[in-house]
Amino acid sequence: MTVVAPGSVVFRNICKQFGAFTAIPDLSLTIEPGTLVTLLGPSGCGKTTTLRMLAGLEHPTSGRILIGGKDVTMLPANERDVSMVFQSYALFPHMNALDNVAYGLESSGMRRKEARERAEEGLALVGLPGMGQRLPAELSGGQQQRVAVARALVLEPQVLLLDEPLSNLDARLRRRVRTEIRELQQRLGFTAVYVTHDQDEALAVSDRIIVMKDGNIAQEGPPRELYETPASAFIADFMGEANVVACDVIDVDGHEATIRVERLTHRVSGRGMRPGPAKLAVRPNAITLEPSAAGSFSGEITHTAYLGDHVEYEVKTAAGTLFVVDPAVERALAPQTNVAIAFKERGIALING
């Protein structure tokens, strides 16, 4: 089974209101064919409303939605060339896996024999060959999720929609299934729109991430760009923990800036900043600690936690309390240790407040 024509997605000035409440004020975005794009954000940010409008389960108050170049703004869900994988899987409990996967095909008028053959192909595609006769209750959570993905894929949609698809799985299974989804998307080349509030999922599966806040796009770009060069304190903290530290930009030379925190100076990407007060996002693993009472930037460890493959510290400094992650478990430092603080080359970014 192949996806012959992955579709693009375009939102043009979409507004969505529920009574007097405006969930999406003015949203414009473009998703290229054959890419997996994640809508990421906290609860209430508008990501699920956006997905539901794309699926045809909600209609915008104003604006246009195009799929594969076709205006589908007011089309009902059953007339859109999309398939959706729900958070709850939405499998029929009285049907076996094969019948669940074949259901959409038969409902669209395909002959039963052909539908079941394609359903068997779909189950094999997601790694469940020979399991078609099992009821959902006889499958693990991960297997049920794969049945739901197979059911969506056999319809050969232009766009596959995934709404929090891993939220009902335990942590270890989530890692495995997200890898399977990403490998499947890359192998078949279909367009996918993936909704989650989990930044690890978004980083692991996406070609691009759209971070939403209050119904607007806070930042979008490739995963690495959003993680390493967040545009704001909100993005820095939402894309993984970050220390937000006050600093001074003391010099700008081309695309680079020299910043100062206390008496520590460091070179970072200038990002169009001018000399003066600024904010710095510092990843916990971009900080190094050395036992020392002296240094250009010093502090005192107030808390130490050993977590097997790394040690976490809280360090009290004149610039505020820093959260630090250090892989050097063999030399864990005790609370009340005075330390000199330095920054690594990567994981430091100037941000807008």
Curated annotation (Swiss-Prot):
Subcellular location: Cell inner membrane
PROSITE patterns reported in the protein's UniProt record: ABC_TRANSPORTER_1, ABC_TRANSPORTER_2, FBPC
Residues the entry annotates as binding ATP: G41, P42, S43, G44, C45, G46, K47, T48
Membrane topology designation: Peripheral membrane protein
One GO cellular component term: ATP-binding cassette (ABC) transporter complex
Function according to Swiss-Prot or TrEMBL: Part of the ABC transporter complex FbpABC involved in Fe(3+) ions import. Responsible for energy coupling to the transport system.
The name this protein goes by in its record: Fe(3+) ions import ATP-binding protein FbpC 1
